[in-house]
């Protein structure tokens, strides 16, 4: 059951439907990309962030949260697995920020069980779910999801981001 009053936009999104690539030389550029992506998200969307340690996944999640105007500091939820960030404005979705990094040593059945125990699917109608390290798993939460891959350029602070909409 969804909360009344949450605005839902049509699933077609101008500018993001085909995906894209961006070079991000500064942290501010990663925040800006996150904000740009965040402006296009609506309740029910799942965003899967992947890339090596230090690639900028949490920074991108901060940018998404800035655009969504949700409460609380956005920090990596590695040790608590998931954090709910409530919307500051009525009629806008919450953001659930998930990080499954510490579960990666588990076998895939255990990992799916842990992910399932978070009951994220119950939040999908009223929230945008952003999952760090969820590649190959989080996509199962929604038929339509945004995949964002961040890579670090060797011997540089520059990151390369690639994103596309996927279907499960």
Curated annotation (Swiss-Prot):
Keywords: ATP-binding, Cytoplasm, Magnesium, Metal-binding, Nucleotide-binding, tRNA processing
GO biological process: tRNA threonylcarbamoyladenosine modification
GO molecular function term, any single one: ATP binding
Pfam families named among the record's database cross-references: TsaE
Keyword tRNA processing in record: yes
Subcellular location: Cytoplasm
GO CC aspect terms: cytoplasm
Binding positions for Mg(2+) per the UniProt entry: 58, 132
Region ranges (Disordered): 1-21
Binding sites annotated in the UniProt record for ATP: 54-59
PANTHER family: TRNA THREONYLCARBAMOYLADENOSINE BIOSYNTHESIS PROTEIN TSAE
Record family assignment: Belongs to the TsaE family.
Function: Required for the formation of a threonylcarbamoyl group on adenosine at position 37 (t(6)A37) in tRNAs that read codons beginning with adenine. Is involved in the transfer of the threonylcarbamoyl moiety of threonylcarbamoyl-AMP (TC-AMP) to the N6 group of A37, together with TsaD and TsaB. TsaE seems to play an indirect role in the t(6)A biosynthesis pathway, possibly in regulating the core enzymatic function of TsaD.
Protein name as catalogued: tRNA threonylcarbamoyladenosine biosynthesis protein TsaE
Species for this entry: Mycobacterium bovis (strain ATCC BAA-935 / AF2122/97)
Source taxonomy: Bacteria, Bacillati, Actinomycetota, Actinomycetes, Mycobacteriales
